């Protein structure tokens, strides 16, 4: 069985992962069939690049992504696009669905960032109040 998974490269304390198609029996950093992309979690924001055509090919022939690889691929909408192709939708329908998915995803990410900013602001205010009352 072929798995789409992460292969760790990089140096100590600075991981970089290659997204690879590998036999399920191979070791984590062992033999693989093809490099499909790269994930750099230490960069801010995290950097994710991959070859869309080859990833779609491996998904179409039955390669199973691991949980972590699936989560990374899901962020880009590739799994949703593959699902629509399997269901037999036309390229036009897929294009419009992907546009609406992208808008929903962008708004979801923006809400998350706004929520973080509000939490930071409240924390600073609470610390300032605490300092005032203690001082």
UniProtKB/Swiss-Prot annotation:
GO terms for cellular component: cytoplasm; small ribosomal subunit. SUPFAM superfamilies: Ribosomal protein S16. Transmembrane segments: none annotated. Pfam families: Ribosomal_S16. One of its GO terms (biological process) is translation. Residues 94-135 are annotated as: Disordered. Residues 105-116, 124-135 have a biased composition (Basic and acidic residues). GO terms for molecular function: structural constituent of ribosome. Keywords: Ribonucleoprotein, Ribosomal protein. Belongs to the bacterial ribosomal protein bS16 family. This is Small ribosomal subunit protein bS16. The gene is rpsP.
